[in-house]
Amino acid sequence: MPVQGSQRRLLGSLNSTPTATPRLGLAANQTGARCLEVSIPDGLFLSLGLVSLVENVLVVVAIARNRNLHSPMYCFICCLALSDLLVSGSNMLETAVILLLEAGALAARAAAVQQLDNVIDVITYSSMLSSLCFLGAIAVDRYISIFYALRYHSIVTLRRAWRVVAAIWVASVLFSTLFIAYCNHAAVLLCLVVFFLAMLVLMAVLYVHMLARACQHAQGIAQLHKRQRPAHQGVGLKGAATLTILLGIFFLCWGPFFLHLTLVVLCPQHPTCSCIFKNFNLFLTLIICNAIIDPLIYAFRSQELRRTLKKVLLCSW
């Protein structure tokens, strides 16, 4: 990863020897001060990546097998699963190669390792960017389906959805390539941070507006049936809880990584920031956790998808 704190892990593994590190401990930063460092065991990292990989493969297979799921909404969900799959797979590949290099089971020249590192970085960052974009696309799709229900099928067509998908993938690959090439430029890192904040604000505004519409709808039904206010309050509380969980998971899983990028620009040499940089692998692990949670939030809640997945699993046996 071309970000301070990762220190080109593949290249560094060529001349390194494996050392046992505690999962949670105190480490000395550049000034000798003590700071908290969370070390993620390789076995745990690979296990989380494998869980994410299996989950998202199942989502992609289920959507591909069922023609009823070939709609714009499921198109975005499928692409989100594919992005999360690539995030997990690329990080697992990098970790596996590092372990093989450190164990001496894999011999490679520095130039070859450099090229492999660049390829993995492009895949990782492009899939991260596309994952964020598809989360935003899903929010926009749901917003249109609620506020423009009668015109939804004319606004959000499958052809337009595929154009959006193609644009997201092309933009993600191009920007990630630029990011790898100019990772030491503050402007590039700040663009990534601004992009994350823009996605966070977009999702928050759209989902809050949808929650307000749901509360108004519930209030109208309650008045129609002459119910009391608590029924409306129950809908509001349930919706608020769902919204808090959705945005909270998004912020907690992605926020630390983009905080890392922000601090790389603002205080690359400060002792406190140096302590945070030491937890870069923890921030990557949180993104892997988000890739595990995404199918639970956006895919597996669909009864149609669950039925298809059940059929696929039964047929495989």
UniProtKB/Swiss-Prot annotation:
Transmembrane annotation, as ranges: 38-63, 73-93, 119-140, 164-183, 192-211, 241-266, 280-300
MF term (GO), any: melanocyte-stimulating hormone receptor activity
PROSITE patterns per the UniProt record, alphabetical: G_PROTEIN_RECEP_F1_1, G_PROTEIN_RECEP_F1_2
Domain of life: Eukaryota
Stretches assigned to the Extracellular side: 1-37, 94-118, 184-191, 267-279
Location, primary (coarse class): membrane
Residue ranges that the Swiss-Prot or TrEMBL entry lists as coiled coil: none
Subunit: Interacts with MGRN1, but does not undergo MGRN1-mediated ubiquitination; this interaction competes with GNAS-binding and thus inhibits agonist-induced cAMP production. Interacts with OPN3; the interaction results in a decrease in MC1R-mediated cAMP signaling and ultimately a decrease in melanin production in melanocytes.
Role noted for this protein: Receptor for MSH (alpha, beta and gamma) and ACTH. The activity of this receptor is mediated by G proteins which activate adenylate cyclase. Mediates melanogenesis, the production of eumelanin (black/brown) and phaeomelanin (red/yellow), via regulation of cAMP signaling in melanocytes.
Protein known as: Melanocyte-stimulating hormone receptor
Organism the protein comes from: Semnopithecus entellus
Top-level taxonomy: Eukaryota, Metazoa, Chordata, Craniata, Vertebrata
